[in-house]
């Protein structure tokens, strides 16, 4: 493994070497048995528990640096690791270990009139480059998911989480070695220089097969603009909740507060609340009061001043903002049609929820909104691969090609065709 180097070193040469090693490791990993990959992941989970004190000490360094730089509380929350979060990380990896191995699965098969038997079979993608920012848990999730799917991975975390990610990466390597798999199958970029990102986006001389960016709008935009390899885009989570006139108020209140306030700094946190104008008198005040009581700042459109005066006014900028904080924008809309219109204008195509009891309203919401995840009578905070039973996720893909929604093990595979004959030649 490459050791940490100074930024003044030749970043391009370092990255090309990482790419070469990843490509070499991808070949044996692609044919590794399900049992060996399972053993590696179980060993990783064990290492996380055994090294928890080291990981927390490394995280303390990152947190100290972050606080000195004056970052927002939401950023600190995303960066923070605790004993509980490390246990959750380990449990998530154990869950990934127990998933069915996708590699070699026959997705479909059929016979042709000429006697050929055709199978479509899952295969690893190859080498995946993951570029992310302040969440150190992505190091564990991405490494484990790529390993389960038989892919080598190059991890480029943000400089803010460097010490935490490096400590977690050591656990991943320990698991690989324990199972007799190549240590270079999971590599971490050892330089903070942003030129490393640019090098990854070139594909490292054909070594990288796909890039997964996980971070803010500027990072994802850069990746999409500069990448010379396919990208699974994880855009911002500008998530909406629409509360219909038919909604159960008690249920709506519980869901809205959870969707916004459970963890404000995750991409599945609700950022805009849309309320059916036809039930404003019944719904608006109790929903807003519940949010305020939970410690949330409410920014409301002008028409809500008659229902609940004294709220901060919302602007068009608010409808386009992923706060990742205890702030929500609220608007009255003309029923389901108004909700659909607003969401289709402002959504990032990540996650939207509807709270309603009228089936026809729900079906319109599901059919006319084209976001990756749509929920009915459930919190947007369920937009998570672990909650979907995937064991974890490498991100929420908001594009429409190949992977969409939570990118789990299955989405990190491609396929090939196996055609079996008995001597056929084409006339």
From Swiss-Prot:
Pathway: Amino-acid biosynthesis; L-proline biosynthesis; L-glutamate 5-semialdehyde from L-glutamate: step 2/2. One of its GO terms (biological process) is L-proline biosynthetic process. PROSITE patterns: PROA. Its main location: cytoplasm. One of its GO terms (molecular function) is NADP binding. It holds the Pfam family Aldedh. It catalyses: L-glutamate 5-semialdehyde + phosphate + NADP(+) = L-glutamyl 5-phosphate + NADPH + H(+). SUPFAM superfamilies: ALDH-like (SSF53720). Its EC number is 1.2.1.41. It is an enzyme of class 1 (oxidoreductase). It is found in: Cytoplasm. InterPro entries: Ald_DH/histidinol_DH, Ald_DH_C, Ald_DH_N, Aldehyde_DH_dom, G-glutamylP_reductase_CS, Glu-5-SA_DH, GPR_dom. Gene3D superfamilies: Aldehyde Dehydrogenase, Chain A, domain 1 (3.40.605.10), Aldehyde Dehydrogenase, Chain A, domain 2 (3.40.309.10). Disulfide bonds: none annotated. GO terms for cellular component: cytoplasm. This is Gamma-glutamyl phosphate reductase. It comes from Sinorhizobium medicae (strain WSM419) (Ensifer medicae). The lineage of its organism: Bacteria, Pseudomonadati, Pseudomonadota, Alphaproteobacteria, Hyphomicrobiales. The gene is proA.
């Amino acid at each position: 493994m490459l050791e940490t180097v100074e930024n003044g070193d030749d970043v391009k040469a370092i990255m090309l070497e990482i790419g070469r090693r990843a490509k070499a490791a991808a070949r044996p990993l692609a044919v590794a048995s399900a049992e060996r990959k399972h053993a590696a992941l179980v060993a990783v989970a064990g290492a996380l528990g055994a090294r928890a004190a080291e990981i927390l000490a490394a995280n303390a360094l990152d947190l100290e640096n972050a606080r000195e730089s004056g970052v927002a509380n939401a950023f600190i929350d995303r960066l923070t690791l605790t004993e509980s979060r490390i246990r959750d990380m380990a449990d998530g990896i154990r869950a990934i270990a127990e998933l069915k191995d996708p590699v070699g699965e026959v997705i479909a098969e059929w016979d042709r009139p000429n006697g050929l038997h055709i199978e479509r079979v899952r295969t690893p993608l190859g080498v995946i480059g993951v570029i992310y920012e302040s969440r150190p848990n992505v190091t564990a999730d991405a490494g484990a998911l790529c390993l389960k799917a038989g892919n080598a991975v190059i991890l480029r975390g943000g400089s803010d989480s460097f010490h935490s990610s490096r400590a977690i990466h050591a656990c991943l390597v320990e698991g690989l070695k324990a199972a007799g798999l190549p240590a270079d199958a999971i590599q971490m970029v050892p330089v903070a220089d942003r030129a490393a990102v640019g090098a990854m986006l070139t594909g490292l001389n054909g070594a990288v097969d796909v890039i997964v960016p996980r971070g803010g709008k500027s990072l994802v935009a850069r990746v999409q603009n500069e990448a010379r390899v396919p990208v699974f885009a994880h855009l911002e989570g500008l998530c909406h909740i629409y509360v219909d006139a038919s909604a159960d108020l008690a249920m709506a209140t519980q869901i809205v507060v959870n969707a916004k306030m459970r963890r404000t700094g995750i991409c599945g946190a609700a950022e805009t609340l849309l309320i059916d104008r036809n039930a404003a008198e019944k719904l608006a005040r109790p929903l807003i009061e519940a949010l305020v009581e939970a410690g949330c700042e409410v920014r409301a459109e002008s028409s809500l001043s008659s229902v609940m005066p004294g709220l901060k006014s919302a602007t068009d900028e608010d409808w386009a903002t992923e706060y990742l904080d205890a702030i929500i924008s609220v608007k009255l809309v003309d029923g389901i049609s108004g909700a659909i219109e607003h969401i289709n204008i402002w959504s990032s195509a990540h996650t939207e929820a509807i709270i309603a009891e009228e089936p026809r309203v729900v079906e319109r919401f599901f059919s006319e909104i084209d976001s990756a995840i749509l929920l009915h009578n459930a919190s947007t905070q369920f937009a998570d691969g672990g909650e979907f039973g995937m064991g974890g996720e490498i991100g929420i893909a908001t594009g429409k090609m190949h992977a969409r929604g939570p990118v789990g093990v299955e989405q990190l595979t491609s396929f090939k065709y196996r055609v079996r004959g008995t001597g056929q030649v084409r006339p």
